Amino acid sequence: MRKGAEFEELAVKYLEGIGYKVIHRNYHCRVGEIDIIALDGGTVVFVEVKGGKTTDFGDPAERVDRKKMERLLRCIEHYLHKYPLEDYRLDAIVIRNGEIEHIKGVELY
């Protein structure tokens, strides 16, 4: 199983459990990927998933650096060029020691 797939599966189950409809998993473009794309009512939500079984090596949320955010933004732009949308947002799901934190409306710097 690919690194991170276990956490993405937990995130999908969580999102579906709160009523989101997952429409893409691991959406690839030439510069990177978007972990999950889902619908929250009429809003398309791009979801970045980070997880860790422990926090012994730091918090999973701290693994998103500027370069990762730039690649993610370019992938979102690629998706929006292919599928023009007006109502969308970026969320993050951080899984620490099996606990899920859902951060809605993450700002891209």
Regions from the PLM with identified roles:
Residues 54-76, 82:
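Mg2+/Mn2+-dependent nuclease catalytic core
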Residues 31, 44-46, 87, 100:
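Structural motif
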Residues 82-109:
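Domain-level recognition of nuclease-like catalytic cores that cleave nucleotide substrates
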